[in-house]
Swiss-Prot record:
Protein name: Uracil phosphoribosyltransferase
This protein's pathway: Pyrimidine metabolism; UMP biosynthesis via salvage pathway; UMP from uracil: step 1/1
Gene Ontology BP annotations: UMP salvage; uracil salvage
Keywords associated with the record: Allosteric enzyme, Glycosyltransferase, GTP-binding, Magnesium, Nucleotide-binding, Transferase
């Protein structure tokens, strides 16, 4: 299911990211901040456990989350820019990495790196990629995570295309998608319109 996190702060920050004159330093900071804000909504489903705590006045019931069961997996390379944002809220989460790029000619996924912590049916897994375009890389990543035993999977992006959302919903209907914006469409090269360009290039200043 798709969840568009519609919040004034996110709209404001995403607009700055879209501007072509926004430099890499500000782009990185905004990506981290928006990821943090989306994470707030994307973690509503995770379980909480009771414990007793003592205030300066009396004992009372409290709650905690076991963030050691949480696994954050960025899709390289642009997904790396989202990791710090989610770790600010979940500092004990494990971090894996999936290296996938989309062949510009065939638009098919090409895998080149895969390293994750041990996954099990109680792992709360968050796959990160700023741009959900064709959905090819996302579907490939989700499929591999499931093959390793992952069941509770959430996909977090900054901007999504209708085509990418439909592709994930068809291939993995059990995966929830959280995004800051559902943009209009893909162009002939598989880029999201209006989008914000190549997130990886803008993040790492490679063009």
């Amino acid at each position: 299911m798709l969840y568009v996190v519609d919040h004034p702060l996110i709209k404001h920050k995403l607009t700055i990211m879209r501007k072509k004159e926004t430099g890499p330093k500000e782009f990185r900071e905004l990506l981290r901040e928006i990821t943090l804000l989306i994470t707030y909504e994307a973690t509503r489903h995770i379980p909480v456990y009771e414990l007793e705590v003592e205030t300066p006045l009396e004992k009372t019931k409290g709650y905690y989350i076991n963030d050691k069961d949480i696994v954050v997996i960025p899709i390289l390379r642009a997904g790396l820019g989202m990791v710090d944002g989610i770790l600010e809220l979940l500092p004990n989460a494990s971090v894996g990495h999936i290296g996938i790029y989309r062949d510009p000619e065939t638009l098919k996924a090409v895998d080149y790196y895969f390293k994750t912590p041990k996954l099990h049916d109680k792992s709360e897994i968050f796959i990160l990629d700023p741009m959900l375009a064709t959905g090819v890389s996302a579907i490939d990543a989700i499929t591999k995570v499931k093959e390793l035993g992952g069941k509770q999977i959430t996909f977090i992006s900054l901007i999504s295309s209708p085509e990418g959302v439909k592709a994930i919903e068809k291939a993995h209907p059990d995966v929830n998608i959280y995004t800051a914006s559902l943009d209009r469409e893909l162009n002939d090269h598989g880029y999201i319109l209006p989008g914000l360009g190549d997130a990886g290039d803008r993040l790492f200043r490679t063009k």
